[in-house]
Amino acid sequence: MAAKVEPFWIRKTLDQLDHEEWESLCDGCGLCCLQKLEDEEDNSVYYTRIACKLLDLKTCQCSDYPNRMKFVPDCIQLTPGQAEEFKWLPPTCGYRLVSEGKDLPLWHHLVCGDRDAVHHERISQSGRMLAEGSVPEDDWEDHLIFRAG
């Protein structure tokens, strides 16, 4: 009987992942690309349903991922060295889960093989987001959806 091989996200740390493994941890939910507000008193991070100008509101994918930093200078670029700071990511995020030594959820494409499961399970905000330019920044508090961190 062959020994069971643990998936890479169980047997490796974030620092040990190659580029392809790292990128594959992203479940495609797009939540990290939503505009966020930070409570200055307790540093809590609140997610809004307002999407970055490059985020496709249906697919939850960046419309110009390779060049995103040029068009959105404050775009978040996750790296393994930031793992200690991943508490602000959604609790369902593969990067956060692996950094905390947890397994990926059953709906994650690396587990179930279906990249659309994140939408079918309503983890993503597909179809429920607002375009960044459609909401004045002063009104973002009216569109909070959850707290992380």
Swiss-Prot record:
Superkingdom of origin: Bacteria
InterPro entries from the UniProt entry: Puta_zinc/iron-chelating_dom, UCP006173
Family assignment from sequence similarity: Belongs to the UPF0260 family.
Protein name: UPF0260 protein Pfl01_1392
